Amino acid sequence: MKTIMIIENNQTYHNIYKTMLKDNDYKFIHTYDGYEAMERMDETTPDLIILDMLMDMITGDTFFMYLRNIPEYANIPVIIISSAPERLYNHLRITDPNLAFIEKRSLDEETLIREIDKKLSFQESTRRIVSRLPEAPAPDTKSASVVDNSNN
């Protein structure tokens, strides 16, 4: 069973996500801001994160940048669900295939579960491909030559 971390400061939305995830056999971890999420990630690394952007303490933007700069967390899929317009976050999606966006006003269970399944499937496919790649050979430092350009 996959674990999803919900980072949302609104209790009503927490309850909505909880119902949607339980109905589709996902485990979930509730957090109410980016700071609490950072602390909880030390205990449990989720398979996917649902992230609100407009929060107190540590905002969604700050948490997202933190997440992408920690190697162990950098490839965790994130679904931003925000009341802010999607166009504000297009620059992030262009460079991050593990990111999706859903506007809160158009949120429904089918859309959320489809995005979750799509991101988790992409993550699993990527893992399988990477696991089949041969390891890069270590550089051969003995045969490397040093060029002396002091006479030029």
Question: What does each model-found stretch correspond to?
Answer:
Residues E8:
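Conserved acidic carboxylate
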Residues Q11-I29:
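Two-component/phosphorelay signaling modules centered on CheY-like receiver
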Residues H30-E39, G60:
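Helix N-cap/capping motif at the beta->alpha junctions
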Residues E39, D61-A74:
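Short amphipathic alpha-helix used as the core "switch/output" element in two-component signaling
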Residues T44-I50:
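Active-site beta3 strand of CheY-like receiver
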Residues D56-M57, E86:
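The feature encodes the CheY-like receiver
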Residues T62, A84-K118:
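Alpha4 helix (beta4-alpha4-beta5 surface) of REC/receiver domains from two-component response regulators
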Residues S121-N152:
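CheY-like receiver
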